[in-house]
A protein has these predicted regions:
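TM-loop-TM module centered on a large, flexible mid-protein loop between adjacent transmembrane helices
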Residues: 94-95, 101, 133, 246-311, ...
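Helix-loop-helix junctions that connect adjacent transmembrane segments
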Residues: 19, 24, 58-62, 66, ...
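Membrane-helix boundary/coupling elements in multi-pass transport proteins
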Residues: 88, 111-125, 223, 228-236, ...
Length: 461
């Protein structure tokens, strides 16, 4: 995709974002949708958790990625099935509401909202980890604060540039990663490390499956966004064909990319305990394989990517809150407010920025687990939606139908539930508390289930 195409696509997305009614223009082709999904995920996400996952799994990060890829593929299949059944702009909130129950759909959407609200927090935390690697004398909270101030300010004053250049940043991130892999391979082959290429990153006699499952439950963070393209169904040409294809292409491309990169990293460093800061293992590896120059390039590229990703995620979260406020799901006076001059939901942008400040009090494992609670709620219920749809709506009871509507989504359901319960205990507690708040709130909204909850408009899901 060239810059002119990015500008053209930016125009259509901006037009869609401010449209309150009517049909959204179908202007997105398959390649556009794939690029949007990859931009949302951020290819450099592969470096985010390498250190902590290697520590948890005992040096089997690629094995943990293979496990989460299986769960993601089953879930991608279920998303594809539901897009074909409900081709309007949708999400797991829509699918649960349509196939099961409006109240349950609200609670699922409420739990999944954790992803949107706290992804900017993860970005700020990652920025502080990488900047602290370059400037160890500066307290990490300063980098967190500066990152949030910058992303919030750009959301308030300069978001259009971020939309255009996100596409260029995807290419930049891939180039930085390719250089990283080449330098890693060179170090394994010609460096005096004593390490070789083997299957040890995937399997050794010391491999612990519970530990690999625990690692995989955190690695779901790397895939957040692969399903976000389902919300573009109304803007995509031939959505029943192109959205399912895009979901699989995004999941397959990202999965192969993550496994390849972490295989070479793990081959070079089977034991990350040699690093003083396990969370910051990736920038230290960059310094080791490429010296101070590549370390600076790596840090610079990563921080720019984090800022761009943070801008997009803060924009998405504030827009979601605005949609819920406008439709009466949340208090309209605050969440439905739009600044009369800028046309932006400024209160929501500031609120998401304030929530991101909680990064000062969490480590990367806790923060990733908290966000993944919402992700596994979404992944679990999209698989369950396919099964429920089969029993309630599907008349075909052939062997093929049973395989595609029960066995495949059932496998995805089982994988995701197991991964869900492999999360950190603190994340499970916070997730359950968040869900309980949502339950109390829906009791208030529906007058103890006497009325249906407000429905979120399609173009904001």
């Amino acid at each position: 995709m060239n810059l002119s195409e990015a500008k053209e696509l930016n125009g259509s997305l901006q037009e869609s974002a401010i449209s309150d009614g009517g049909q959204l223009k179908r202007s997105l082709k398959l390649r556009h949708v794939v690029f949007i999904g990859l931009a949302y995920m951020s290819p450099l996400a592969v470096f985010d958790t390498f250190g902590i996952i290697s520590d948890i799994t005992g040096g089997h990060v690629p094995a943990a990625y293979l496990l989460i890829i299986v769960a993601i593929f089953f879930t991608a299949y279920s998303y594809g099935r539901m897009v074909k059944k409900y081709p309007s702009a949708g999400s797991v909130y829509t699918y649960t509401r349509k196939t099961m129950n409006a109240h349950l759909g609200f609670l699922v959407g409420w739990s999944a909202m954790l992803d949107y609200l706290f992804l900017p927090m993860i970005n700020a935390l990652l920025a502080s980890i990488y900047m602290s690697s370059a400037f160890p004398g500066v307290p990490s909270w300063i980098w967190i604060f500066l990152t949030i101030v910058i992303t919030t300010a750009l959301n308030l004053f300069g978001v259009k540039l971020a939309v255009i250049f996100n596409y260029l940043l995807v290419i930049l991130q891939v180039l930085v990663t390719v250089i990283f892999v080449i330098l890693t391979i060179r170090m394994i082959m010609y460096g005096d490390t004593g390490n070789t290429f083997s299957l040890n990153p995937f399997y050794t006699e010391q491999l612990s499956f519970p530990a690999v499952f625990a690692g995989a439950s955190i690695l779901a963070l790397s895939f957040l966004g692969f399903d976000a393209v389902t919300t573009l169904a109304e803007e995509t040409i031939e959505p029943k064909k192109n959205i399912p294809r895009a979901i699989f292409i995004i999941a397959l491309s990202a999965g192969a990319f993550f496994v390849t990169v972490t295989y070479f990293m793990q081959s070079l460093f089977p034991d990350v305990s040699v690093f003083g800061d396990i969370e910051g293992a990736s920038p230290e590896i960059a310094r080791y394989i490429g010296g101070a120059l590549f370390h600076s390039i790596f840090i610079s590229g990563y921080v720019v990517a984090v800022l761009a990703c943070g801008i997009t995620q803060q924009m998405s979260a504030s827009r979601l809150l605005y949609g819920m406020g406008r439709d009466g799901v949340l208090p309209k006076k605050f969440f439905g407010y739009v600044h009369p001059r800028t046309g932006l939901p400024v209160f929501n942008i500031l609120l998401v920025g304030a929530l991101a400040l909680t990064a000062m009090f969490l480590d990367l494992t806790e923060a990733a687990s908290l966000i993944n609670f919402g992700a596994f709620v979404a992944f679990t219920f999209v698989n369950l939606s396919v099964i429920v749809y089969f029993f309630r709506r599907e008349k075909n009871r052939s062997v093929k139908s049973i395989i595609t509507s029960i066995i495949i989504p059932g496998a995805g359901l089982a994988f995701n539930i197991y991964l869900w319960f492999s999360l950190e205990k603190s994340a499970m507690i916070l997730g359950v508390v968040w869900a309980a708040i949502g339950f109390v709130y829906i009791l208030y909204l529906t007058k103890f289930f006497k009325v249906s909850p407000p429905e979120l408009s399609n173009n904001d899901q």
